[in-house]
């Protein structure tokens, strides 16, 4: 019998990098510049409970938290009263330039605070070692609240179905620029923390761009990224109102898994991806019998599903039933003796439904006079971050007017039926209210998950220990919680009469009904531990079960190197696709005409005798002649994916398919006509050689279904004619197999630069290298352009063998196959640009129309939040040095 030594070594824990909008701490700077004060923040209780669980109680995971410090405030002492008062840190008045030593000191303070939190938890059954796991994102600049503008003033309203008046273009642009920098600062910080094999978990709408930024940063890594969206996700009709809608979706689909609070939110997201990104999706059921989607976009697959967040039920019950809470409960009951207590706690914003709640309560008192003097509504309204905004001020006035109206109509000198508290209340007071409540009333008009509802049910589940029964919950149908607490009394908050009837019914329930309701609701409450483990387990399964999990990212085009290579080259060849590359994709192909800016850039490129420019498009000869050849005769043109060519300054087209049998067109056209009749919005584009069936203007689901069916039918007979059936962007094209863009590229590169093309002559691969191009920029966006990129890569490989000693100073042959689209797109190109706008910026850079700074790709930030090596960064460093010198001088009494 063989025995093996038992492995007693500790199990290696999976590292998790948790990315949150803001660290769960409030940071203050005291009177001394080294006096840091750290305290816990309020709000996001469910998320912070998840962070606590991973940090203190999970033995499976090692957590690292990356988050913004939030607005750092300074404590100012009143000279007369000596009382400390908090004021926002404003760099205009008091520059806060932190030295590296100060940043390290504050980080250590945060770590110590986390450890002290752990020591306060005396009854944890599982103890995980506390690591130095807090990694602050530093964004110390003037007007610290600027980082919130785009998320709070543009994204948040749209996600909650609020269409704000259009912002001024320049203001929205500045907000967006800050939003991008905010996400890039996180990417930079994660780059310092990340190790191969880590799981990255990103939370909520401040960080929508981060998944794709991380994929670009860790290009060669099999990186696992999960994203959880805590807020609602709107229908496509609302989401598409966002001016940066595509960029936001592009950012998100860099994740491996995107998760929402409920199925309707995930369905809306998938719909937006289909309509705005031309994505496809397969629907199935997950282990919880909920809908999940495998979304295919840019050649990669993303899992999209829902998993409602929970609460820390164990901690809530522990905190809610203490002697201190017992005494507070007794005090509240004595204050409202013999009265039914309805409680509500909401943020005072336009979606929490405080106004709707007050109107419903007013209707209730009017409809049921027997309840007057018998019921009190205790409403706690927490101030929002933008408390001083005009909208919040108007809402506050409206709420106060309603409260005064109800109290004056139905109250008296001894009693007011509405007790409204516009403040943040301590946790012990909140838990006391949950315990004494006879009814919890939640009337939000839109939210992701209302944790007040979950906490109320949790507390009420244990009231039987006090010889009481759990009391009912009235919940808005527009709250994400209504999909979880299915046995709550669900109402439409806009129907005040229906809500009033529900209040009356809930208050009249007998003990048996309350007991049944309590047990049902308690079983429906998800715990934060289950939510955390399920989400992370799913990501781990994806990582271990999928051999093709690695999604290689195409790096952004290095434009500074491109510019230098362009300047050094003498024989430059430009190869451009048209639709989706030089112009955006539009519903009607006939509307995709060149812009004035494109004409200007092409004219400047053509004016340089060292340049040759070719447009290699799927468009027909007529279109290319009208919009390009007729206006810029210096352009070389290739139509119908290489079927026709027209040389520079030449009037005649050469048909490269002249000897090909075209009888196949009749049969293909008949099949396409059949599907055009069956698919409203589709149409056939009949070129001289190729036939293309377009379905961009159809209902996406129907168009995709019929496109798949059409392709299968065409493939059943096209092999007999040596034809290729290609999937384009919302189209199916049929053309001769031997003709493609790659053959045109091969002909143009293996050619003496600057000499006319002999279309009927074969390709010679024996030309001296110094007669061929030394700079080739090839741009395209779809499947057909991969033939160009593939051919360029093949030629480069050939040149490495034939001319190993003739590389340029950058170690290459000046070949730049560049795809236009997302970095996660499957391609053989060596680099990418995101969209036609970036294409024009890049070409503008080459002809001197655009500065290098304007055409910068991602923004690299320094520790103060400035663009690295920019003018503002240099000024910041100088100001920092001056400030440190001034401060040192004040300590020593010296003059600066």
Curated annotation (Swiss-Prot):
Stretches for region Glycosyltransferase: 1-554
Enzyme Commission number: 3.1.3.12
Major subcellular site: cytoplasm
Gene3D superfamilies: Glycogen Phosphorylase B (3.40.50.2000), HAD superfamily/HAD-like (3.40.50.1000), Trehalose-6-phosphate phosphatase related protein, domain 2 (3.30.70.1020)
Expression triggers: By heat shock. Repressed by glucose.
Activity regulation note: Inhibited by EDTA.
GO molecular function: trehalose-phosphatase activity
Catalyzed reactions per annotation: alpha,alpha-trehalose 6-phosphate + H2O = alpha,alpha-trehalose + phosphate
Domain of life: Eukaryota
Pathway assigned in UniProt: Carbohydrate biosynthesis
pH dependence: Optimum pH is 6.0.
Keywords: Cytoplasm, Hydrolase, Stress response
A GO cellular component entry from the record: alpha,alpha-trehalose-phosphate synthase complex (UDP-forming)
Single Gene Ontology BP annotation: positive regulation of autophagy
Pfam family of the protein (one): Trehalose_PPase
Subcellular location, record wording: Cytoplasm
Catalytic class of the enzyme: hydrolase
InterPro entries recorded: Glyco_trans_20, HAD-like_sf, HAD-SF_hydro_IIB, HAD_sf, Trehalose_PPase
Cofactor: Mg(2+)
NCBIfam families: HAD-SF-IIB (TIGR01484), T6PP (TIGR00685)
Function: Phosphatase catalytic subunit of the trehalose synthase complex that catalyzes the production of trehalose from glucose-6-phosphate and UDP-alpha-D-glucose in a two step process.
The protein's assembly and partners: The trehalose synthase complex is composed of the two catalytic subunits TPS1 and TPS2, and at least one of the two regulatory subunits TPS3 or TSL1.
Family: In the N-terminal section; belongs to the glycosyltransferase 20 family. In the C-terminal section; belongs to the trehalose phosphatase family.
Something else known: Present with 22700 molecules/cell in log phase SD medium.
Name of the molecule in the record: Trehalose-phosphatase
Gene that encodes it: TPS2
């Amino acid at each position: 019998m063989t025995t093996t030594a038992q492995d007693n070594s500790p199990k290696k824990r999976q590292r998790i990098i948790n990315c949150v909008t803001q660290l769960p701490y409030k940071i203050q700077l005291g009177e001394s510049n080294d006096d840091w004060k750290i305290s816990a923040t309020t709000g996001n209780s469910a998320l912070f409970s998840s962070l606590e669980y991973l940090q203190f109680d999970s033995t499976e995971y090692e957590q690292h938290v990356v988050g913004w410090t939030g607005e750092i405030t300074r404590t100012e002492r009143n000279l007369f009263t000596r009382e400390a008062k908090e004021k926002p840190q404003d760099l205009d008045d008091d520059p806060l330039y932190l030295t590296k030593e100060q940043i390290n000191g504050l980080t250590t303070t945060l770590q110590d605070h986390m450890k002290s939190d752990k020591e306060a938890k005396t009854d944890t059954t599982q103890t995980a070692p506390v690591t130095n796991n807090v990694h602050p994102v530093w964004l110390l600049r003037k007007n610290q609240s600027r980082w919130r503008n785009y998320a709070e003033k543009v994204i948040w309203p749209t996600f909650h179905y609020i269409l704000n008046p259009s912002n001024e273009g320049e203001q929205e642009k500045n907000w967006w620029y800050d939003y991008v920098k905010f996400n890039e600062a996180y990417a930079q910080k994660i780059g310092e923390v990340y190790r191969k094999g880590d799981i990255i978990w990103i939370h909520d709408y401040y960080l929508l761009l981060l998944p794709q930024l991380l994929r670009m940063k860790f290009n060669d890594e099999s990186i696992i990224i999960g994203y959880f969206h805590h807020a609602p996700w709107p229908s496509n009709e609302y989401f598409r109102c966002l001016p940066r809608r595509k960029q936001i979706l592009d950012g998100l689909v860099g994740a491996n898994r995107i998760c929402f609070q409920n199925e309707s939110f995930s369905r809306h997201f998938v719909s937006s991806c289909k309509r705005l990104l031309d994505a496809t999706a397969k629907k199935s059921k997950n282990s919880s019998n909920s809908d999940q989607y495998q979304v295919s976009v840019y050649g990669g697959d993303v899992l999209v599903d829902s998993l409602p967040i929970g609460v820390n039920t164990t901690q809530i019950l522990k905190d809610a039933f203490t002697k201190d809470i017992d005494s507070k409960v007794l005090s509240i009951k004595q204050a409202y003796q013999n009265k039914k207590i309805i409680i509500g706690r909401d943020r005072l914003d336009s979606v929490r439904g405080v106004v709707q709640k007050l109107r419903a309560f007013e209707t209730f008192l009017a409809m049921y006079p027997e309840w007057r003097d018998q019921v009190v509504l205790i409403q706690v309204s927490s101030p929002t971050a933008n408390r001083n905004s005009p909208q919040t001020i108007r809402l506050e006035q409206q709420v106060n007017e309603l409260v005064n109206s109800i109290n004056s109509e139905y109250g008296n000198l001894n009693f007011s039926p509405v007790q409204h508290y516009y403040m943040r209340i301590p946790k012990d007071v909140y838990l006391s209210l949950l315990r004494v409540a006879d009814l919890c009333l939640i009337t939000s008009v839109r939210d992701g998950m209302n944790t007040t509802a979950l906490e109320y049910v949790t507390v009420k589940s244990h009231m039987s220990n006090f010889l009481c029964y759990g009391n009912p919950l009235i919940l808005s149908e527009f709250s994400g919680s209504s999909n979880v607490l299915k046995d709550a009394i669900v109402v439409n908050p806009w129907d005040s009469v229906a809500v009033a009837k529900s209040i009356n019914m809930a208050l009249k329930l007998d003990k048996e009904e309350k007991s049944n309701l309590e047990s049902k609701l308690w079983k429906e409450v998800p715990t934060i531990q289950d939510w955390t483990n399920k989400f992370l387990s799913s990501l781990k399964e994806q990582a271990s079960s999928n051999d093709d999990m690695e999604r290689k990212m195409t790096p952004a085009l290095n434009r500074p190197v491109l510019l230098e290579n362009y300047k050094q080259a003498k024989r430059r060849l430009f190869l451009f696709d048209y639709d989706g590359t030089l112009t955006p994709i539009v519903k009607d192909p006939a509307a995709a005409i060149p812009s004035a800016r494109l004409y200007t850039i092409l004219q400047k490129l053509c004016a340089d005798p060292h340049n040759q420019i070719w447009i290699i498009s799927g468009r027909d000869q007529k279109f290319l002649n009208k919009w390009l050849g007729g206006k810029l005769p210096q352009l070389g043109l290739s139509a119908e994916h290489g079927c026709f060519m027209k040389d520079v300054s030449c009037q005649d087209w050469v048909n490269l398919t002249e000897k090909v049998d075209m009888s196949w067109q009749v049969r293909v056209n008949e099949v396409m006509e059949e599907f055009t009749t069956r698919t409203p919005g589709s149409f056939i584009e009949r070129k001289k050689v190729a036939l293309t069936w377009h379905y961009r203007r159809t209902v996406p689901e129907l168009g995709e279904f019929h496109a798949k069916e059409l392709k299968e039918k065409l493939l059943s007979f096209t092999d007999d004619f040596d034809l290729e059936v290609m999937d384009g962007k919302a189209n199916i094209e049929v053309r001769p197999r031997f003709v493609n863009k790659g053959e045109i590229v091969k002909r143009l590169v293996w050619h003496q630069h600057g000499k006319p093309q002999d279309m009927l002559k074969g390709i010679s691969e024996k030309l001296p290298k110094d007669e061929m191009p030394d700079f080739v920029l090839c741009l395209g966006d779809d499947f057909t352009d991969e033939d160009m990129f593939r051919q360029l890569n093949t030629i480069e490989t050939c040149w490495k063998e034939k001319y190993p000693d003739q590389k340029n100073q950058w170690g290459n042959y000046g070949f730049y196959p560049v795809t236009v689209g997302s970095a996660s797109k499957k391609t053989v190109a060596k680099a990418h640009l995101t969209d036609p706008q970036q294409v024009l910026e890049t070409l503008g850079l080459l002809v001197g129309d655009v500065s290098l700074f304007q055409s910068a790709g991602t923004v690299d930030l320094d520790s103060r939040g400035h663009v690295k090596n920019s003018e503002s960064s240099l000024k910041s460093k100088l100001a920092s040095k001056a400030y440190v010198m001034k401060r040192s001088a004040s300590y020593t009494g010296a003059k600066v």
